[in-house]
Amino acid sequence: EDLCKTLENGYDFLILCNPNNPTSSAIMQEDLRKLIAFCSGKNIFVMIDETYVEFAPDINAVTAVPLTREFTNLMVLRGVSKFYAAPGMRLGYGITGNREFLAKMKEKQTPWSLNSLGAFAGKKMLLDHDYFRRTRELILGERDRMETELKKLPIFKVYPAYANFILLKIQKEGLTSADVFEACIKKGLMIRDCSSFQCLDGEFVRFCIMMPEDNTRLLDVLKQL
């Protein structure tokens, strides 16, 4: 509702990251439908970046792809940099039901925007269902374990995670995000000090889900703070 009120002020384009970066939160599809419908009535085009959607517990509950059949003011973007760990491929794609918008994009498309290596690798990655299943099992299983263990530590508030990282708010007086970062880096563990993000200054850290043994090492460090 707050976002809709903001959009009343003459905007014509809305970009969302869902699941969100840096919070790892997500907007559910039914709420997205209401938002996109509102934007349609205000002639606002909506672009949703779903780079992290494969990490969501229930992808179908989060993705806006089915909504491209209902709304012409919507485009959904996806890529292979996160879930498929291939940022160097620079490969992504968009889904929209707006043929006019798509035609205009093709007019502006640069020649050879997708090379043969990217096309070959992309097809292999997106059709590798075994990798998809195993990666989700590992990341989602470890994310659930980390959330459960971290909720036992009163010094942190754990936010629900829909991406491959977890956001923590530090609740121990005198302990800063820089302190937590330093404690982790001394043990060879890289986490993100979120002080550079707007509204997350000094009180928030986040970390990506790693292999089980590294996640356990991180838990051990956080328990000692």
Residue ranges and their predicted role:
Residues F13-C17, M47, Y93-I95:
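Structural motif
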Residues N73-Y159:
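PLP-dependent aminotransferase class I/II
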